[in-house]
Amino acid sequence: MWKDLFVKKKKYAAIPSEPLRPEVPEGVMTKCPQCKKIMYTKELVKNLRVCLSCGYHHPMPARERIESVLDEGSFREYDAGMTSVNPLGFPGYIEKLEADRRKSGLNEAVVTGEGTLEGHPLAIAVMDSSFRMGSMGSVVGEKIARAVERAHEQRMPFLIFTASGGARMQEGVLSLMQMAKTSAALKRFSNDGGLFISVMTHPTTGGVSASFASLGDYNFAEPGALIGFAGRRVIEQTVREELPEDFQTAEFLLKHGQLDAVIHRHELKEKLAVVLAIHAGGGESGWWRN
């Protein structure tokens, strides 16, 4: 024991090595934010990005959404080359746009076009939250307004899937103007009898929820979608009250009369086809409400 006091101690210690874990390539697996289950992304995509364990509706890329609701091969895109600029000279904005284009494969946060759904022709707009969180800038507003005007000219219904964090701050008042522009286009469309179906997905917030997203003849939503204008914390601080746990969810809005239905993604195409069939009239009225 006393000898140990004079023995020079080692300056290092052996650390047992952990067995090497096989590396999983990025994107192969997806973790559900609700139930925390990890699943193959391929299986999730096959299930329309609905969690196989708990039914949570994961965000769906715009082109996957279009494939899931329109008849195969019927989609024809509008204004595919339209891209945002930096009108206010906002620092770093162009670089962020370019990064999102590489990541998402899209030029902007919305894809618009026309196609058929169970044989019914329509114009469609699908927002994608992977591009600038689906925020609405000048190009998003312009593409949606143009799609509405084409639906008006060709006497087709207009269908939109919304997913957005609201107006795009890097474009200032120009982004806020899109609320009025899109709403005005829809008002002209509606006055002439046009059928507008809005499907709100997670999340639909800010200026998008306060404008075109809520103007549908039919306002639908996916289960669990967050829908609202201001954030929960801001509202609680303003009204000085604790809000219900399910506040601003699709189910809460349905219960309070702000939605017509909450529809599971697996049933959405069928339900939309029923609505279109109900309103598909003959003669000059065509595909109109009247």
From Swiss-Prot:
Similarity field: Belongs to the AccD/PCCB family.
PANTHER family, A to Z: ACETYL-COENZYME A CARBOXYLASE CARBOXYL TRANSFERASE SUBUNIT BETA, CHLOROPLASTIC
HAMAP family registered for this protein in UniProt: AcetylCoA_CT_beta
Subcellular location: Cytoplasm
Protein name: Acetyl-coenzyme A carboxylase carboxyl transferase subunit beta
Needed cofactors: Zn(2+)
Residues that coordinate or bind Zn(2+): C32, C35, C51, C54
Pathway(s) where this gene product acts: Lipid metabolism; malonyl-CoA biosynthesis; malonyl-CoA from acetyl-CoA: step 1/1
Quaternary structure and partners: Acetyl-CoA carboxylase is a heterohexamer composed of biotin carboxyl carrier protein (AccB), biotin carboxylase (AccC) and two subunits each of ACCase subunit alpha (AccA) and ACCase subunit beta (AccD).
Its job: Component of the acetyl coenzyme A carboxylase (ACC) complex. Biotin carboxylase (BC) catalyzes the carboxylation of biotin on its carrier protein (BCCP) and then the CO(2) group is transferred by the transcarboxylase to acetyl-CoA to form malonyl-CoA.
Organism, as annotated: Geobacillus thermodenitrificans (strain NG80-2)
Listed GO CC annotations: acetyl-CoA carboxylase complex
Co-factor note (free text): Binds 1 zinc ion per subunit.
Gene3D superfamilies (UniProt xref): 2-enoyl-CoA Hydratase, Chain A, domain 1 (3.90.226.10)
